């Protein structure tokens, strides 16, 4: 199965950096044993995470950063 296009994925995040971080965190969860929200599409956790993001099965929430004093 092909990767979701970057155009589709960028509509799900406010920046490429956010997309990379969200994908990496989800891939780590899958590697740690959390089940995928999709049928078996790949053995690669990053590929699974990208498909989950592309299909709106997972989202991210930006936390407010605390200001350094």
Swiss-Prot record:
Keywords: DNA-directed RNA polymerase, Nucleotidyltransferase, Transcription, Transferase. It is an enzyme of class 2 (transferase). Disulfide bonds: none annotated. It catalyses: RNA(n) + a ribonucleoside 5'-triphosphate = RNA(n+1) + diphosphate. GO terms for molecular function: DNA binding; DNA-directed RNA polymerase activity. SUPFAM superfamilies: RPB6/omega subunit-like. Its EC number is 2.7.7.6. GO terms for cellular component: DNA-directed RNA polymerase complex. GO terms for biological process: DNA-templated transcription. InterPro entries: DNA-dir_RNA_pol_omega, Pol_omega/Rpo6/RPB6, RPB6/omega-like_sf. It comes from the Bacteria. Belongs to the RNA polymerase subunit omega family. Promotes RNA polymerase assembly. Latches the N- and C-terminal regions of the beta' subunit thereby facilitating its interaction with the beta and alpha subunits. The RNAP catalytic core consists of 2 alpha, 1 beta, 1 beta' and 1 omega subunit. When a sigma factor is associated with the core the holoenzyme is formed, which can initiate transcription. This is DNA-directed RNA polymerase subunit omega. The gene is rpoZ.
């Amino acid at each position: 199965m092909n990767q979701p296009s970057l155009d589709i994925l960028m509509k799900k995040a406010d920046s490429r950096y956010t997309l990379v971080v969200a994908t990496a965190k989800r891939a780590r969860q899958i590697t740690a044993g959390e089940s995928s929200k999709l049928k078996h599409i790949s053995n690669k956790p990053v590929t699974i995470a990208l498909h989950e993001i592309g299909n709106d099965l997972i989202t991210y929430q930006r936390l407010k950063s605390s200001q350094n004093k």
